[in-house]
């Protein structure tokens, strides 16, 4: 018996950095103070359909760090990728983009954030792994906001 059913496929076409920003705030005073940092993280995922089989995903990570309640730095990167996804439903494609593709881009974004912070004169920041599956499920279960 021959199976003529087309199998789903996934291919990474390109991984690239779309935007990088690092800003030291309150320098040089911030380097003279006792270092007692607190950081806020923001993650944003945007997808763009290029054509029926190709999609761009932008993973933006923003880190805002304060030292003793005074802003010290803001580091931001948008790491992007182009992915070819075939023979999947729209719901499956959405899931693959927001989970697997985001997980693929995260290590690249993490390295750029870490490098920017160190080159900015600060101690390295340990960005923990991100559970993109949980973020996606939360996003899918939350009510949609009207604009």
UniProtKB/Swiss-Prot annotation:
Biological process terms in GO annotation: protein folding; protein tetramerization; protein transport
Subcellular location as annotated: Cytoplasm
NCBIfam families in the record: PRK05751.1-2, secB
Major place of residence: cytoplasm
Subunit-structure text: Homotetramer, a dimer of dimers. One homotetramer interacts with 1 SecA dimer.
Keywords assigned by UniProt, alphabetized: Chaperone, Cytoplasm, Protein transport, Translocation, Transport
InterPro entries (UniProt xref): SecB, SecB-like_sf
Protein name: Protein-export protein SecB 2
Entry superkingdom: Bacteria
């Amino acid at each position: 018996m021959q199976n003529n059913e087309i199998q789903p496929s996934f291919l990474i076409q390109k991984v690239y950095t779309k935007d990088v920003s690092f800003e030291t705030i309150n320098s040089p005073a911030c380097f003279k103070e006792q270092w007692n940092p607190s950081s806020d993280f923001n993650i944003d995922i945007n997808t763009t359909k290029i054509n029926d089989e190709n999609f761009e995903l932008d993973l933006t990570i923003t880190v805002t760090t304060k030292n003793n309640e005074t802003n010290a730095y803001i580091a931001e990167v948008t790491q992007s990728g182009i992915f070819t996804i075939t023979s999947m439903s729209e719901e499956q494609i959405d899931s693959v983009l927001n989970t697997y593709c985001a997980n693929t881009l995260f290590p690249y974004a993490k390295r750029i954030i870490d490098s920017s912070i160190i080159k900015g004169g600060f101690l390295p920041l340990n960005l923990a792994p991100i559970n993109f599956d949980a973020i996606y499920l939360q996003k899918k279960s939350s009510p949609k906001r009207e604009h």
